[in-house]
From Swiss-Prot:
Protein name per the record: Diaminopimelate epimerase
HAMAP family: DAP_epimerase
Gene Ontology terms for molecular function: diaminopimelate epimerase activity
Assembly information from the UniProt record: Homodimer.
UniProt EC number: 5.1.1.7
Residue numbers marked as site, Could be important to modulate the pK values of the two catalytic cysteine residues: 157, 207
Keyword Cell division: no
Superkingdom: Bacteria
GO cellular component: cytosol
Length: 282
């Protein structure tokens, strides 16, 4: 009944990697609530590793702290790759997700790189409630936030570009309102971005199902695409987050490559039915 897990983070994005390859039961809502409410195990996302069903090495399920499922989590995917590499399962991986195959690797410098695939830029490929002709400029407003750019990288993101210091914007006030806007029947990730040069921007994110987060890898990818679409940056930029930097390359073939560090906090065993756990002794 006990399942191996590791508490990790990607630039402060709190991740639990759970090894369910041999588990009899999947994670229950009770277990998710118990882990999310415990200060030691509180997380933004659970990355559950399962045997694959397609041409992949492993299948990944992603759970938010509120019990909802996510379709993509860039930092969580990087943590999974680090976990797999640390368990001597290789350095290059193909991971099956609900939106397709994601490829990633641990580089020789120790950083983790993930190919997030191509973004969806057409409104017909996005869960929105009304017709949108130009997703590069969408009329949605909350306080000083207006003129959003919508980008989907498996999950939907609304990016608002701000000329002033984004630290002065109360995202905890506007994020929930925009996340639940009627335009987004499946809710939305909300980010504010400040361009600092042609090669960098600063980002803060209100994450769907998790709230204000220190880092969101898919938001970093979406913001880089949005900035390039508007002619604000080059294809290869640094995205500055509260806890560090993610390197984002929006290639000519439109694949998004995200590279950055991960951190292991502790490992242990947990019960996927109840969420009770025990740390490993070092």
């Amino acid at each position: 009944m006990k399942t191996p897990f590791s508490k990790m983070n990607g630039l402060g994005n709190k991740i639990i990697v759970a090894d369910l390859r041999k588990a009899i039961h999947n994670i229950t809502p009770q277990a998710i609530q118990a882990l999310a409410s415990n200060p030691q195990t509180h997380f933004d996302q659970i990355m559950a590793i399962h045997p694959p069903t397609q041409d992949a090495d492993f299948r990944i399920e992603i759970w938010n702290a509120d019990g909802s499922m996510a379709k993509a989590c860039g930092n969580g995917t990087r943590c999974v790759i680090e976990w797999l590499a640390n368990h001597n399962l290789g350095n290059n991986f193909r991971l099956e997700t609900s939106t397709g195959i994601v490829e990633g690797k641990r580089q020789t410098d120790g950083l983790i790189s993930v190919d997030m695939g191509r973004p969806y830029l057409n409104a017909k490929d996005m869960p929105v409630s009304r017709e949108i002709i130009d997703t590069n400029h969408v009329d949605i407003t909350a306080g000083p936030l207006q003129d959003a750019c919508l980008v989907s990288v498996g999950n939907l993101h609304a990016i608002f570009f701000i000329e002033s210091n984004i630290q002065n914007i109360p995202l905890e006030k506007y994020g929930p309102k925009l996340e639940h806007d009627p335009l987004f029947p499946e809710r939305c990730n909300i980010s504010i971005a400040q361009i600092t040069s042609k090669k960098s921007l600063t980002l803060r994110t209100w994450e769907r199902g998790a709230g204000l987060t220190q880092a969101c890898g898919s938001a970093a990818c979406a913001s880089a695409v949005a900035a390039y679409r508007r002619g604000l940056t080059e294809r290869h930029i640094d995205v500055n987050l509260p806890k560090g930097i993610l390197s984002i390359l929006y290639r000519d073939d439109e694949h998004i490559i995200m590279t950055g560090p991960t951190e292991h906090e502790f490992s242990g065993l947990f019960n996927p039915l109840t969420g009770t756990y025990k740390k490993d002794h070092l």
